[in-house]
């Protein structure tokens, strides 16, 4: 932060790392936002990091690694989306509030300004209150957010699973309404989010959300179809419920005895 400040730039910790720090679970992957242009951020990172890469520079992002710590520094930006793609047209923004407004959920739209005399907590969308209430809500209108980037609907189910949060009713209704938009997302991106749901502490919650919102009908139709399958031994209400229970038992077994993170 001091290197950015010395060159007249601002730097703020932002997004997931702020959320996780408030939850007492800050990791080694840190995201920052700045008013410095990517080329300037790269120069500063080159002075600090052991390795620097700029594969995301077209979107304003430069990354670096030092020891076990990985950082991504992204220039303030605004985004405009084509209706048939989740890849945005990026324009550099003027302030951090505009940058935070593009985030997926309010709990990910908080920042900690590090180049002021004292660290300043920035929370224009009441993310701290939503964090305390364990609620997923969008900074703006949910329809706008999910139309812009339909993958955020999968992320809602993932965060609900990982953090044991509830999705605000208006957000949940928007997901049901716009579930069909998930079709523009690549299979690889969908797979990654679904894997994170499976690896979460409460996969039942995320999978149930995918089924109840209609997302599963489009990305993994085999799952909701299990509800139509009858357990021939009548030990369970349906094959879906049985499958979820087996998954939970497998996770409990792995947590108790240790084992691979994921085998499919």
Q: Where are the predicted features?
A:
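Catalytic cores of the polymerase beta-like nucleotidyltransferase superfamily
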Residues: 1-264
